């Protein structure tokens, strides 16, 4: 596996947005190891406002509400088989929704953000949770990638 060459491009809608870049890279490395990806991974992450999240959720999913994370994958994995890198796509994370959910679920913001980041990565790789069977499989994969970081509710 190509270590520490994975690239995460992060854009934020304001300067004081909190994100956890070191841990995001650790999770991306765990993701590559789990799926046996032996090339550089490129990922775009946009941290957005509630307004932008709601607007994108309506435009792309016809759901008129703010959501915690949206994933827009580059699904042409056949193309990336021929490339020296894998461009996974873009995760759009709603900063305010993460903060609210952290309170609701009694998690730290760090844990909520990074768990949803991991969840989004797995979506980008083609997994979904439309059925109970899919949900169990996806939860298992997310936990396998996330849990080695040992991030607790209080971190």
UniProtKB/Swiss-Prot annotation:
It is found in: Cytoplasm. Zn(2+) binds at residues 119, 123, 129. Its EC number is 3.1.-.-. GO terms for molecular function: metalloendopeptidase activity; RNA endonuclease activity; zinc ion binding. InterPro entries: MetalPrtase_cat_dom_sf_prd, YbeY. Its cofactor is Zn(2+). Binds 1 zinc ion. It comes from the Bacteria. Gene3D superfamilies: Metalloproteases ('zincins'), catalytic domain (3.40.390.30). One of its GO terms (biological process) is rRNA processing. Keywords: Cytoplasm, Endonuclease, Hydrolase, Metal-binding, Nuclease, Ribosome biogenesis, rRNA processing, Zinc. Single strand-specific metallo-endoribonuclease involved in late-stage 70S ribosome quality control and in maturation of the 3' terminus of the 16S rRNA. Belongs to the endoribonuclease YbeY family. This is Endoribonuclease YbeY. It comes from Mycoplasmopsis synoviae (strain 53).
């Amino acid at each position: 596996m190509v270590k520490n060459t994975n690239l995460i491009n992060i854009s934020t809608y304001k300067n004081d947005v909190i994100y956890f870049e070191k841990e995001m890279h650790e999770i991306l490395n765990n993701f590559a190891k789990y799926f046996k990806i032996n090339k550089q991974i490129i990922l775009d992450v946009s941290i957005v406002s509630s307004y932008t999240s709601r607007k994108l959720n309506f435009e792309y999913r016809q759901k008129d509400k703010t959501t915690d994370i949206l994933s827009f994958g580059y699904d042409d994995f056949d193309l990336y088989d021929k490339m020296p890198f894998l461009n996974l796509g873009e995760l759009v994370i709603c900063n305010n929704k993460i903060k609210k959910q952290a309170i609701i679920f009694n998690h730290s913001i760090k844990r909520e953000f990074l768990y949803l980041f991991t969840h989004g990565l797995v979506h980008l790789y083609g997994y979904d949770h439309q059925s109970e069977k899919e949900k169990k499989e996806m939860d298992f994969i997310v936990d396998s990638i996330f849990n080695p970081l040992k991030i607790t509710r209080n971190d």
